[in-house]
UniProtKB/Swiss-Prot annotation:
The gene is hslO. Gene3D superfamilies: Hsp33 domain, HSP33 redox switch-like. InterPro entries: Heat_shock_Hsp33, Heat_shock_Hsp33_C, Heat_shock_Hsp33_N. It comes from the Bacteria. Belongs to the HSP33 family. This is 33 kDa chaperonin. The keyword Zinc applies. The keyword Zinc applies. It is found in: Cytoplasm.
Amino acid sequence: MADQLIRATAADGGIRAVGVITTRLTEEARQRHKLSYVATAALGRTMAAGLLMASGMKRVGSRVNVRVKGDGPLAGILVDAGLDGTVRGYVGNPHIELPPNAKGKLDVGGAVGNGYLYVVRDIGYGYPYSSTVELVSGEIGDDVAHYLVTSEQTPSALMLGVFVGASGVTAAGGLLVQVLPKAARDEALVAKLESRVGALSGFTPLLQAGKTLPEIFHDLLGDMGLTIFPESQILRFHCGCSFDRVLGALKMLGEAELQDMIVKDDGAEATCDFCGRVYQASSEHLAQLIVDLQTESSVSG
């Protein structure tokens, strides 16, 4: 099944639902960063959460940054997701492994530890909206749901899942169901929705059982006036890094530092944290940057 995002509404627009399949992009992240099992689960859940949150933004080019900063051995998570369906991310310690938790599952909460969730929404106006909440469990799903209720005052049910086997990621994705103000006053409706979401064993078991996103929507909201939008959105792991950007960053170091790199290292190497791509800048590249800096200095002087 292709990585995709599908939207739906129910209860005359009082319920908003978004589902994502992120199996392939999570596997790509695992391979790029050489992630351990628990690191794959942690990053995969956070990427799915980022895409779900970004899906509610309106302006073209809008993006959301999700940073999980805990005191656990994973050493943090950073994800950048866009309304356009692109996502990238990394963890501080990609190779960490822990014993299973009390439920026999990957111990994402133990890897993350105690700390905070930071969310920055950039809607393209130059004034990003940021918010911080304390982590509830470190399992990502609970933490993002807590953020949505606390910071956006929107009752939300969020399921995230990543299944990692010996051959890699075989199922990953998530589901976000939000009760909007027009339906929040219907206590019976809210109770029914909470009961159904609570009865689910998780998101990845549904995918492993062969369920599609429309089928999952029907199971949850089929008798609540469900409308599934026919357009699905393709999702993919994508990083906007480039050699030109690397040169721009190196140029900011200044002449003395660049000259030192030429003498000591015969060039420079840079690795993108988000995608793991390695860039090599030769001594000739660095020499040209020095020339550019000298030219700019003489012009401005």
